[in-house]
Amino acid sequence: PLYSSAASDVYKRQTKAYEADKVSIFGGIVATNRTVTKEAAELMKPIFLEIIMAPKFDEGALEVLCTKKNLRLLEVDMEQGAVDPKQYVSVNGGLLVQDLDVETKSVTADMCVTAAKPAAEQMDDMNFGWHIVKHVKSNAIVVVKDGRTLGVGAGQMNRIGSAEIALKQAHAAGVTEGLVLASDGFFPFDD
């Protein structure tokens, strides 16, 4: 995932994600677990997108989006029970089959071992970031604030490089304070 957000409807989610990075979405894929409304479709229409995935598109959304050339709309059952519980990866000379990691445990205040205790909003951002970072590949770092990703760093030889990328993106979005950072592993030094 490049940019993600949490909000009560697709329009608000899309607005928050788009405001975080207006460049990376170009030619991208939008996936949501809520119905795409006409209002959300009108926001997405001017953006070059390859695919929009959602459990449903309302009639107004279809009217708006079906006029776009080369855009594929996919209605997908987003319930966890609809997902194949196995993951298949092709490897040289074979096939790796493993259980799909669909569970994400929530971070709770009693897990916090620092002297400074996070506010409720920071706990929400920690859980949001934790749910996103598990889908980012290799030395993953996600920077979050107010229920949206502001920076994503991945694919670097070390997490410090990924963190630098993610923080640079957050700063480019104009946010420099109150950030929450989620990582898929440990840093090579004490925080």
Please state what every model-predicted region is:
Residues 18-22, 27-35, 178-191:
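A structural-propensity feature for long, helix-poor, extended segments
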Residues 1-7, 11:
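Single conserved hydrophobic/aromatic residue that forms the stacking wall/gate
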Residues 156, 162-191:
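Generic long, charged, amphipathic alpha-helical segments
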Residues 5, 140-147:
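Short beta-strand scaffold segments in enzyme catalytic cores
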Residues 22-86:
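Phosphate/diphosphate-binding loops
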Residues 74-123:
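Long, charged amphipathic helices and adjacent flexible linkers at domain junctions
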Residues 117-136:
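Short, basic/aromatic recognition patches
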